[in-house]
Swiss-Prot record:
Function: Plant non-specific lipid-transfer proteins transfer phospholipids as well as galactolipids across membranes. May play a role in wax or cutin deposition in the cell walls of expanding epidermal cells and certain secretory tissues.
CDD domains: nsLTP1
Alphabetized UniProt keyword annotations: Allergen, Disulfide bond, Lipid-binding, Signal, Transport
Organism of this sequence: Parietaria judaica
UniProt entry tagged with the keyword Disulfide bond: yes
Lineage, opening ranks: Eukaryota, Viridiplantae, Streptophyta, Embryophyta, Tracheophyta
Coiled-coil annotated spans: none
Protein name per UniProt: Probable non-specific lipid-transfer protein 1
Disulfide bond positions: 40-88, 50-65, 66-111, 86-127
Similarity annotation: Belongs to the plant LTP family.
GO molecular function: lipid binding
PROSITE patterns, per the entry: PLANT_LTP (PS00597)
Amino acid sequence: MRTVSARSSVALVVIVAAVLVWTSSASVAPAPAPGSEETCGTVVGALMPCLPFVQGKEKEPSKGCCSGAKRLDGETKTGPQRVHACECIQTAMKTYSDIDGKLVSEVPKHCGIVDSKLPPIDVNMDCKTLGVLHYKGN
């Protein structure tokens, strides 16, 4: 039986938060500047409940996951924040194979976050394009 390490939990939470970078919903205080240590700390605390869903262990995100996702949705709106989040996703996806990128992309939909603006993110994406582009999903 494999236990989840703190490092893998942090990476997962960063991934889920990055997905939320492109969504629009509730307004909250702005996130710290991209690259600051506080950004990942905030994400970790809010999105830890999403881990079982994005690993495919649960069919739906928990209420705690959705609550954190909605809060973080309002904290990551600028181009630089999207670039930083995308880079975090790529790093984590290269490191942890038990995170399903498709499930990460589904968190906003499952949590009722409307007007999701999520581009397809994979390890080959040029994250810097997110500083000027704002993808509007279908």
